[in-house]
Amino acid sequence: MDNRFATAFVIACVLSLISTIYMAASIGTDFWYEYRSPVQENSSDLNKSIWDEFISDEADEKTYNDALFRYNGTVGLWRRCITIPKNMHWYSPPERTESFDVVTKCVSFTLTEQFMEKFVDPGNHNSGIDLLRTYLWRCQFLLPFVSLGLMCFGALIGLCACICRSLYPTIATGILHLLAGLCTLGSVSCYVAGIELLHQKLELPDNVSGEFGWSFCLACVSAPLQFMASALFIWAAHTNRKEYTLMKAYRVA
């Protein structure tokens, strides 16, 4: 194996490993989107009511999004979190202090919730099903797992290529990484579109802002790394095979 191809193969493996770590981290963390809102009082019955509804199995899209808006919420692919006062006083309002302890509470999306239809008017089950938002939501959490699976399968093929001391099988690894990159890009695009459509339905309250979090950024960075790894794998395998064929033809001649 020529040193050029070996170097390209090693660089592609490093890029693949980094993108896999980034993708796994983005899937497993809860900071795809973050809301910033003023700190809420820790003494109102409204706080308790919102928290109880947030953790309820019957919480609909509008219910938990209202809590996310109000309590500095963060959303991942599998969990939603809010920041609430650590010590809630339901019996009487304590005196207002400059600051008080807060704690982050998270609730996981169930599989039923992941596949649940989205409605044209969030929270209103009689408003009809919003097919676009429904399928965007499903794609945004399925595609990252498909991407991760494709990269792992590509890594197995790359390992076999190392054992066989041949770069030719890495063409398949490159193609799988290309597909993984497309899945990651598709997931990111679906997430952005879904968030924009949601905010058109549920406008953010005053003094509340939202921004994409670092989990989302990891997924965004993972996609170009997958494309670069794919290009290096395919180039190394194809060029090495071409030079081997020319050398073999030269020897025969």
From Swiss-Prot:
Membership in a protein family: Belongs to the PMP-22/EMP/MP20 family.
Gene: CLDND1
Primary location: other
Swiss-Prot/TrEMBL domain comment: The C-terminal region is required for localization to tight junctions which occurs in a TJP1/ZO1-independent manner.
Subcellular location: Cell junction, Tight junction; Cell membrane
Residue stretches spanning the membrane: 5-25, 141-161, 175-195, 216-236
Record membrane topology: Multi-pass membrane protein
PANTHER family: CLAUDIN DOMAIN-CONTAINING PROTEIN 1 (PTHR14347:SF3)
Membrane in keyword set: yes
Protein source organism: Homo sapiens (Human)
Task performed by this protein: Plays a role in negatively regulating the permeability of cells to small molecules.
UniProt lineage: Eukaryota, Metazoa, Chordata, Craniata, Vertebrata
Superkingdom of the organism of origin: Eukaryota
Pfam families the record matches: Claudin_2
Keyword vocabulary terms for this entry: Cell junction, Cell membrane, Glycoprotein, Membrane, Tight junction, Transmembrane, Transmembrane helix
Cystine pairings recorded for this chain: none
GO cellular component, one term: cell surface
Tissue: Widely distributed in the adult CNS with highest expression in the corpus callosum, caudate nucleus, cerebral cortex, medulla, putamen, spinal cord, substantia nigra and subthalamic nucleus. Weak expression was detected in the adult heart.
Entry keyword DNA damage: no
Glycosylation-annotated residues: 42, 72
Protein name: Claudin domain-containing protein 1
